[in-house]
Curated annotation (Swiss-Prot):
Keyword tags: Chromosome, DNA-binding, Meiosis, RNA-binding
GO biological process: meiotic cell cycle
Compositionally biased tracts (Low complexity): 467-477
UniProt name for this protein: Regulator of DNA class I crossover intermediates 1
PANTHER family noted in UniProt: CDNA SEQUENCE CN725425 (PTHR35158:SF1)
DNA-binding region(s), residue ranges: 1-228
Pfam families: Redic1-like (PF15089)
Organism for this UniProt entry: Mus musculus (Mouse)
GO molecular function terms listed in the Swiss-Prot or TrEMBL record: DNA binding; RNA binding
Amino acid sequence: MNWVGGSRSRVLIKQERRKQKEYFERNKLKSKLKLLGVVSPVKKPSVSLDLLNLYVVNQISSMKENSETMKRPTHVNMTRDLKVPLRKHDLELPMSPHCVPSKLCIDDMEDSVPYQRIYSKEETGPVQSSQDMKSYRMFNETGNCSYIPPSFPEELRSNRHIRSQHSTPRIGPSPQQFVYENPHSGQFSNGKFPESLFSKLNKHQHVFSSSQTTAEFEAPYKRTNSSETGDFLTKRSMIMGEDCRSLYERRQPDFAMEKPLVQQIYANNGEEFSNFLEDVIHPTQRHLPDNHNSFVSHSMIDLLSKDQPGRRATFTKCGYDSLSDTHVVSSDESHSSSGLINGEFTVPQATSPNFPFNTSYTETCQPNRPCQEYNSNEINEFRRSFEKDCYSIGCGRKGKIESDKQLKELQRNARKHPVYTMADIPLEELHCKQSCDFDQNEIPMERRGMCPLKGQPMSTEKIYLESSQSSQSASYSPRPTESTFSSSTDLISEDEDQIQQQTEDSNKKATETTGNCCLEKMENHFDDITVKDDATAHKQNHKCLQSSEKNNADAFPESQCNSEHTVQNKSTDNCVLQAGRCDVGVQTEEAPLVGNTADVAVQCTIITRCSCMSSPVLIREKESSHPEAGSCTEDRTADTTGGQETPTSNSL
């Protein structure tokens, strides 16, 4: 079937013509080869005619000689503005900057480095500058040198901050030279001085010393906001030794100025300033007496008595050393509260170790110094100050004693029983080592009560007080003392005053309550009265009383950690259960019961913290023991663990 338009026939005709042409060309080639004497190719050629033709053409071209020379390419200028130079010389492009030869002296650049060479006073002279001073304008950022502007007296008067100066490197004048040149510069009054004075004077005082290269990384003086104390804070400066080529730290004094220098500067009215510097450099010589051996000054004790909640935060952060009657703050922990200098003083290498105050309840309370002996006069002063300071607090919260007769009787009882009196205990025992193996939040406190009727010792009553939450109890004394002082005698006496006064107050209140029931049967047992029942009368032998007193004296705690003192009252049917004396310690002994006597009650009061962290929960458990016939019946409440109250009737 033919294609459309007869295209198939045309293709066939072309193929036939090509075959015929190849045939005739082949015949011509053979005839030529025969004429040239070339061997005729094989009848069955494996190479196509195209390749054969290329081979022939290549042979013909190789026979020809290449006599023509290569032509050099001509440069075509794309930008017609430029002209091709005809002469051989350096080209000057119009876009290049103007060439100016540099006149900088690279050898003098090392003088502008902040690490300057330090010369002695004999070698001080002007530093060689560059020949062309205009070149320093390009490098003014690296020329931070000590330069005192001409407006230095004005800045001293106006109390302005020092502005950063970048100028030609040269040696600034010393303070002595500056004062002699400007005799009327800087008049001060009332001991108040600007910041720029000390910073500039200290910057140029001992800057140039022999055989050292100083690199002051951070040495600005900062003044605190308090203008009364006049404390100045300083940071350490890094000193680079030229011989050993190593950095070492050097403790500089707060004011690198000598006393004669200060007197020369302020000859007219500089007495106040010299006295001020003496107070700063030697702060404790005016506060502490000669016979005072404490590590804490009187000003610190007065501050602590006024601001008791800040005791714990203050003493945990700072430690104190005693070096040649100079109060020095340790360099690692430089925190101060009152008029102490916060910084580093020039202290010799062999310094005494720090004695930090021990404020953790979980640690072992050990005295830092041996206990001092106190005579009878100091103990009497201790008692009088105790009664004067703490008696008003107990009377305002619990009421006054009914009559002067009861007060005199209580005082006589306190004298007859020195075992239970806090003031008669030697203070050496209070300083002894105490091992506090209880939790930090719970302080076991305990007292041994004496039955006021017949002198029978009651069972031991143990109270667990939570030191942080005990302020929300029923009858809490809001006078927190939250730290343990082990080396200051004044603080120890103050704490003992509080303990003794609270002991006496609790005993007075217990006596007042029991006086309503049976005042005529009360005996001479004042110090540890805790529980009195109006319908209970017990008898005991004198041997039992002596044994109980001996056990109490032996088991009394040898050391004392003052915590928050709590007096808890619980009255049911004219019976008051009080936690009279809150002495921290561990005492679990009970006096043996002889004859037909019986235990009255055991009360365990535990203050625990709620899950909501709002207020403590009181958990009381009372265990009544062998009831006696003919005794009265009274209702008591036993608090369960869950906080539910269940009325119970116990016959005693």
